[in-house]
Structures are given as C-alpha cells and as structure tokens.
C-alpha cells in the first residue's frame, strides 16, 4: 500500500502503452502531462523555469507520474531539447527533495538512436515513448517499404533499442535498467560549464563549448527550417 509500483516490460513504450498510462485510474497513482514546448519568442531559459513551475504544481496536486511531452509543436511553438528537459527537471526535483516521489516519462519525437535513449534514461527518465519513430514505422508499413506487421516492427525496434541500452550498461558493470536510470555515467564534450552546472549537475566535462543561448539558436534554426520547407511544399 505504501510502495506501489508500476511495472513495464520495456522502458521503450509503444503509443498504446503510453495511452494506457495516461488513462490509468489506479489508487495511489496520479498522472500529469507537462508540455515541454514553448512559444518561439520566449527564451529557452524561461521555458525551462516554466517547466519547473509546472512540475512543482503537479507535485502539489498529488501527481507522482510526470509525462514530459513535446506533442503540439507547430509553427509558433518549439520544443525544449528532450535530454535538456529531462536532466534539468531531474536536477530540480533532486534539489527540492521531490525526486523519489515522482516518476518521469518522456513522450518525444526526438529520440531515435540507442545513444539518445541511453542518455535519457541515464539522466532521469524512467521510460520513453518515441512516437515519431513509431509513426515512421507505420508509414513504412503502409507504403509497403517494410515487409512486416506494424506491431511486430515496433516490437523489434523497441527490443533492439533495449538490447543496445543493456549492452551500454553492462560495459559499466550495471546489471539492471533500474540501476542505470539516473546514473549519469556520461562525460560531456563541448558544453559550457554554466549549462553543465545548472542542468547536468556533477557530469564530468573537461572541454567547454556551447552555451544555453547557442542551444536555443540551434532549436530555432531547426524549427524554422522545418516549417519553411512545409510552407514551400
């Protein structure tokens, strides 16, 4: 009763898995979806601060499963980079002594490679729903570019990602995904010390580099390129 646990077979969630979690009505669990998108004329730093405010509000309201979602991106809204959002919120929850009371799930179109998932789990995510990958798989199946059932193809992808994460963890002497979560066993290269100290606290970083403003500019450039190309289609 005092230690209820939601168990999933794979930390890489299908769209159906996440839908079930969002709709869950089980005593002891309360789910809250927190957007990690922001208006494009807002600074990235303010957007992250707003994420902290929303997480604190959800915690006060009794939520113990936070789903960080970048769904809703449009021509006026850009996403906080998923790893930055996850790690920043992880550090905020640790500093405010809330981390052990809250699980963090990411719903994002950004992660697609094993390293993406490995870093997201390593910096605090408990599970990840790569919805854009699954939408892409569906399109490939529908266009007969993939000779496989959609659900089987998604399952194969999820298992391949999980096997890759397990391989990374095992090289570090970690035997379970649960032990790997939040372990921060990575070294950062090319990120400014202020960004590391504030959002990736205690991560080893011997070489400085891009600032938060540089990251914001990159996000805006990618967003503009995506929507300009759509306008010209």
Q: Where do the model's predicted regions map?
A:
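Glycine-rich phosphate-binding active-site loops on the catalytic face of alpha/beta enzymes
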Residues: 122-140
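Glycine-/small-residue-rich beta-strand-loop submotif within the FAD-binding core of flavoenzymes
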Residues: 88-100, 134-155
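Conserved structured catalytic cores and adjacent interaction surfaces
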Residues: 42-43, 50-53, 58-115, 122
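Flexible, glycine-rich loop/tail regions that form catalytic "lids" or insertion modules at the edges
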Residues: 1-47, 54-58, 62-65, 111, ...
